[in-house]
Design a protein with these regions (language model features):
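Short, recurring structural edge motifs at helix starts
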Residues: 91-97, 125, 155-161
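N-terminal helix-cap/turn-to-beta initiation motif at the start of protein domains
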Residues: 1-11, 24, 97-100
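Contiguous, well-ordered beta-strand patches that form the walls/edges
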Residues: 18-21, 31-81, 174-181
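Edge beta-strand at a domain terminus
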Residues: 1, 76-93, 212-220
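A cross-family detector of function-defining hotspots
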Residues: 13, 104-150, 163-220
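Short, hydrophobic/aromatic-rich segments at coil-to-beta transitions
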Residues: 6-11, 26-27, 44-52, 72-74, ...
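Short hydrophobic/aromatic-rich beta-strand segments that constitute the beta-sheet cores
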Residues: 14, 28-31, 52, 73-77, ...
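Mature extracytoplasmic domains of secretory-pathway proteins
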Residues: 5, 15-49, 144, 148-167
């Protein structure tokens, strides 16, 4: 417990700049941590319940943390609120003005209310907001963007590199200085071919026949 609390030590803010969590010295928001249980995952990327002693009694907080000692470190509070060490964590790449870590409200401000909410399989096994005119989809972890899918035929691009599904895999390797050219399958297998780091704890993966390029915070 001490190890995990030390890992998360510091102040954690919501997207509006409000300090939501203050962790340090065995305390959360000035309340002593009495116990922790239901741990899952590893020390740097995991989840657990923390029982704290408030003036009115005990309370449980469910925390999921992703600590890579980077500006994008995050804690998800009670499954619905994403917190960072700064109100506006930096981002590396964007698509149609949308980047990882944006809130749902910020996405709506840029792209408008999503016309559709779709099951995004086979690209990813979750539902997401779909903008058919742009041919892009956005998924969320709690209240922040965790994936942006750029589909074939979209006029949108990865705004740092200028690339999209019309480009060849080797062009992505050159633009993002990847260690090797991404492997793209040209069959109906839908086998996942891996993620490719592009810096800033962001990753790209590629669908069959370059039907989709996905920008994600996940490395697997």
């Amino acid at each position: 417990v001490t190890k995990v609390l030390n890992l998360m030590e510091g102040d954690w803010y919501d997207a509006d700049g409000n300090r939501v969590l203050e962790i340090g010295g065995g305390y959360i928001n000035g309340c002593r941590v009495l116990a922790a249980y239901d741990f899952a995952g590893a020390s740097s990327h995991g989840a657990g319940r923390f029982e704290i002693l408030e003036s009115t009694g005990t309370r449980n907080l469910y925390l999921q943390w992703d600590i890579r000692h980077a500006d994008t470190d995050s804690i998800k509070l009670n499954d619905h609120q994403m917190l960072h060490r700064t109100a506006k964590p930096p981002f590396n790449e964007s698509i149609a003005g949308i980047h990882l870590g944006m809130t749902a409200a910020e996405v709506t401000a840029v792209l408008g209310t999503p016309p559709q909410v779709l099951d995004l399989s086979p690209y990813v096994n979750t539902h997401g907001w779909y903008y058919p005119d742009l041919r892009i989809a956005v998924t969320f972890d709690a209240d922040t963007v965790d994936r942006i899918l750029l589909l074939k035929g979209s006029r949108a691009i990865l705004e740092r590199s200028g690339l999209n599904c019309e480009n060849a895999p080797y062009e992505f390797a050159q633009a993002y200085q990847m260690k090797h050219v991404p492997h793209v399958r040209y069959d109906d297998s839908n086998v996942f071919t891996g993620c490719h780091a592009i810096g800033g704890e962001e990753y790209l993966s590629f669908g069959n026949r370059m039907e989709c390029v996905m920008l994600s915070k996940y490395w697997n």
